[in-house]
Design a protein with these regions (language model features):
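Generic N-terminal targeting/processing segments that precede catalytic cores or assembly contacts
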Residues: 17-197
Length: 197
């Protein structure tokens, strides 16, 4: 949303705004400690129910085709900044979703340099090294772009797990749209030759 003038939105946001574009940055790896979202451009004064955000994360986890990892993770958003007492402050909204499965990947995903003189460490790293690309993913392009020797350095970001960060940020964007009187809805019109009436 670029430079939109907004009338008083709700009893929680009794101001006129010139709203800049929303900007989303995500970070973290699939098997790292956490996935992070930073959503910049939300106005101050939006009332947000974190149960609603967590409900969106829960719906994401129950989607068709989810991996067995969904039984390990129980996605809950933790606010690191930009929200105080349930009200946005206008600062960049910083969200974290912990990866519980990271406990099983501490040596493989460590941010510190491993002891390359330790044969056990070398064996563990070599055993988890990925050299084959997943079809239809960013693995090949990312490995070429960044000149990685281990595909894991790409696939940890190009993972379905990263969508948790987008879903959490999207729940906050929905709150903003609703404050503006905008509702988003969808339905399937047709699948192949079968259409709804």
């Amino acid at each position: 949303i670029q430079n939109v003038s907004i009338a008083p939105i709700s009893h929680n946001l009794q101001v006129f705004l010139i709203m800049p574009a929303l900007r989303l940055i995500t970070g973290g790896e699939s098997h790292g400690k956490a996935i992070i979202s930073i959503l910049e451009g939300l106005p101050a004064g939006l009332s947000v129910d974190l149960d609603r955000v967590n409900s969106e994360l829960s719906a994401r986890q129950s989607g068709y085709g989810r991996s067995g990892r969904q039984r390990i993770e129980s996605d809950r958003v933790e606010i690191l900044g930009g929200l105080r007492h349930g009200i946005t402050t206008g600062a960049p909204l910083t969200l974290m979703i912990e990866n519980r499965d990271s406990a099983n990947w501490t040596h493989i995903m460590s941010s510190t340099r491993p002891d390359m003189n330790d044969p056990a460490v070398l064996a563990a790293l070599e055993a988890k090294k990925i050299v084959r690309f997943r079809p239809g993913h960013a693995d090949y392009a990312g490995t070429l772009k960044f000149d990685h020797k281990d595909v894991r350095d790409v696939l940890e970001r190009a993972s379905a797990r990263e969508t948790a960060a987008r879903v959490a940020a999207g729940a906050f964007a929905q709150v903003l749209l609703q404050a503006l009187g905008i509702e988003v809805a969808s339905h399937v019109v047709a699948i192949g030759a079968v259409s709804s009436k």
